[in-house]
Amino acid sequence: MRIGEISRKTYETDIEVKIDLDGRGKYNIDTGIGFFNHMLCMIAKHGIMDMDVYAKGDLDVDFHHTVEDVGICIGKSIKKALGNKKSIKRYGTFFIPMDESLSMCSVDLSGRPFLVFQGELKNSKVGEMDTELIEEFFRALAFNAEMTLHIKVFYGKNTHHIIESVFKSFAHALREAVSIDEKIEGTMSTKGMI
């Protein structure tokens, strides 16, 4: 079973994350941030992985520490669940429309952390959450999962729709990248490891 479990406690946050890459899309999410919870549910459901995320953070300061630290923990959990990466497809790219918006996400589980995030988020907030934290979340996740992650928003008007299309495209791209292909002997690299 490909399961990653991480607990992380700092002066700013207390977080527990468990991810089962071979799950059924079940989730229990509670970060104290409604819109963020909603987006994390998209990763589990559309990535068809089981995910538990419990976070208590200094939300009285702002949401930055909680969002970034959840990204750190999800990234570390993905890395742990992948183990030696034997027979994974490694790459995944997916486009998702959400009404008037269109986003693309491309994942390489390369062991080389990198993020490219292109696109305009029209409003500075959705609900009570600052939309600039979306990029911070994906940066923390990508660097701690040691993945190369490209996200591009092509267009959209409604900021909720844009962000939802980003999270769904990430979920589908990740699902493809972590998928097992028995024809792949060892790892998908001429180096012999990733």
Curated annotation (Swiss-Prot):
Localization: Cytoplasm
Family: Belongs to the imidazoleglycerol-phosphate dehydratase family.
Annotated PANTHER family: IMIDAZOLEGLYCEROL-PHOSPHATE DEHYDRATASE (PTHR23133:SF2), IMIDAZOLEGLYCEROL-PHOSPHATE DEHYDRATASE HIS7 (PTHR23133)
Alphabetical GO biological process terms: L-histidine biosynthetic process
Keyword presence, Ligase: no
Catalytic reaction equation(s): D-erythro-1-(imidazol-4-yl)glycerol 3-phosphate = 3-(imidazol-4-yl)-2-oxopropyl phosphate + H2O
Protein name as annotated: Imidazoleglycerol-phosphate dehydratase
This enzyme's EC code(s): 4.2.1.19
Recorded superkingdom: Bacteria
GO CC annotations on file: cytoplasm
Protein keywords: Amino-acid biosynthesis, Cytoplasm, Histidine biosynthesis, Lyase
UniProt xrefs under InterPro entries: IGPD_sf, ImidazoleglycerolP_deHydtase, ImidazoleglycerP_deHydtase_CS, Ribosomal_Su5_D2-typ_SF
GO MF, any single term: imidazoleglycerol-phosphate dehydratase activity
UniProt pathway: Amino-acid biosynthesis; L-histidine biosynthesis; L-histidine from 5-phospho-alpha-D-ribose 1-diphosphate: step 6/9
